From Swiss-Prot:
PROSITE patterns: GLYCOSYL_HYDROL_F1_1 (PS00572), GLYCOSYL_HYDROL_F1_2 (PS00653). The gene is lacG. InterPro entries: 6P-beta-galactosidase, Glyco_hydro_1, Glyco_hydro_1_AS, Glyco_hydro_1_N_CS, Glycoside_hydrolase_SF. Pfam families: Glyco_hydro_1 (PF00232). It is an enzyme of class 3 (hydrolase). D-galactose 6-phosphate binds at residues 19, 116, 159-160, 297, 428-429, 435, 437. The active site is at residues 160, 375. Its EC number is 3.2.1.85. This is 6-phospho-beta-galactosidase.
Amino acid sequence: MSKTLPKDFIFGGATAAYQAEGATHADGKGPVAWDKYLEDNYWYTAEPASDFYHQYPVDLKLAEEFGVNGIRISIAWSRIFPKGYGAVNPKGLAFYHNLFAECHKRHVEPFVTLHHFDTPEALHSNGDFLNRENIEHFVNYAEFCFKEFPEVNYWTTFNEIGPIGDGQYLVGKFPPGIQYDLAKVFQSHHNMMVAHSKAVKLFKDGGYSGEIGVVHALPTKYPYDPNNPADIRAAELEDIIHNKFILDATYLGKYSEKTMEGVNHILAVNGGQLDLREEDFAALEAAKDLNDFLGINYYMSDWMRAFDGETEITHNAKGEKGSSKYQIKGVGRREAPVNVPKTDWDWIIYPQGLYDQIMRVKQDYPNYKKIYITENGLGYKDEFVNHTVYDDARIDYVKKHLEVLSDAIADGANVKGYFIWSLMDVFSWSNGYEKRYGLFYVDFDTQERYPKKSAYWYKKLAETQIID
């Protein structure tokens, strides 16, 4: 028998400003660190991306036609404040007002993120969120947006605080490209969570209408050998780096003893210290019960083995299967069981991990209120044939994840919506234009859109709520 989803469920599609808009310098937009970083380090740039800056009416019309009733959109901070603070760019304001109006015209509810990996260059180059001044700049920007855009009903402070710390200071695939600095990873996580908490408190104190939450990437971590205490420990430490530290800050308003024990162990082995202040914890504590929802981005799980050597991480950027490597001194190394499928980019396909992660949030953080799956999808080297893509692998991936999501709801989790990554093809931060995720194929030369087989499947799903 087919599984089902609730009648009031959001069947959404996700986007992000820098990955979709293009127009990186148009109409007064300020630079972001990615502009130069992609030029210097990768084989592509954010021009033209999906030209969403001009094509959004087309994309929203397609969304409406294919039953997509929610869209994740992020505001490019540097389109509003080109330097991150100070002078406002009126053309940026006009763009987002027009975009949100089009969403409502098409009956597609916008879920709007304030920061999706794109701190304005002026602030990124002075330390990004490692510089505490930028916490205040972010909160001021957030307050400006809450006032300016009353037409938005769902706000998200940050997209993926974890992968920002990881990408910028551990793997080094995001600007400024620093590697293996675990203290910076945790400090970035912490400072961004303080910024999140201050913005949420301000939103609630200001009496703004609508809801506010945060989007966390939560890849589930398992021990390679569940009977080996050393593997169990490796999975726990890896979970602290990517998930638990951030979830504790979100919903406990502090870091549990067990979390701090793990953090202190990791820093004792790898060096570095954290600056955690009393007033930070006051901010976290004040916001811990104010989050209206948690967005979970879930693509994959990892298995961890105990490991004694030095840290070495190789990022698989070009989809050459088996080329990635991940091992951290004092933590462990990733090694998946042979029978678990992987994508060409070595992303492990394991739907059960989504169920386990949802139930973990429900159990460990009972003040979570409700969950949206804010990103989930399959990156693929799509083959464009007869004006479409026969993306059965993508349909299978999404179907299996929706089935476990249905199980989680049946088992008492409050999950209210799902946003496929991505609505239309966009460029991937560290993989470029070859790795496609969309329901709609984008010809990046002509900017024409073509519905894939998955779009027709998703339309039927949205109409019936039956996962077939």
